[in-house]
Amino acid sequence: MRIIGLDVGTKTVGVALSDPLGITAQPFETITRKENNKLRRTYARIEQIISEYDVTEIVVGYPKNMDDTIGERAKACEEFAAALERRTGLPVTLWDERLTTVEADEVLEECGMRRENRKTVIDQLAAVFILRGYMESKQK
């Protein structure tokens, strides 16, 4: 009954997983998107994680603009989420991700992590914030 949270960017996808009970969210990995593979390898890796960890639900960060409008990145996330739903047959929820990367960067800075080292984990941490927000809303 795990849930996977995804922070989809143009170059990377941050991945977070819930525990089997769906209570906590942990950083899992960052998938690097290479231009030449388009999204095929990205989808394949996500599908592999879903299979290995018995994921039953997918949450994709939805980067709305601060004025609540839908921009190009949000449209790309809508397409990504729709493709994941088609490919996996699992329910996919778009979750407002405004400022999650900023929040993740601030947390890493407070922990004393150097800026150049943050790149490897910032997307995973943003995915944790997306997933945690979604799970907390379900508990209410």
Curated annotation (Swiss-Prot):
It is found in: Cytoplasm. The keyword Aminoacyl-tRNA synthetase does not apply. It comes from the Bacteria. Could be a nuclease involved in processing of the 5'-end of pre-16S rRNA. Disulfide bonds: none annotated. It holds the Pfam family RuvX. SUPFAM superfamilies: Ribonuclease H-like (SSF53098). One of its GO terms (biological process) is rRNA 5'-end processing. Belongs to the YqgF nuclease family. CDD domains: YqgF (cd16964). GO terms for cellular component: cytosol. Keywords: Cytoplasm, Hydrolase, Nuclease, Ribosome biogenesis. Transmembrane segments: none annotated. The keyword Ribosomal protein does not apply. The lineage of its organism: Bacteria, Bacillati, Bacillota, Clostridia, Lachnospirales. Its EC number is 3.1.-.-. GO terms for molecular function: nuclease activity. PANTHER family: POLYNUCLEOTIDYL TRANSFERASE, RIBONUCLEASE H-LIKE SUPERFAMILY PROTEIN. This is Putative pre-16S rRNA nuclease. NCBIfam families: RNAse_H_YqgF.
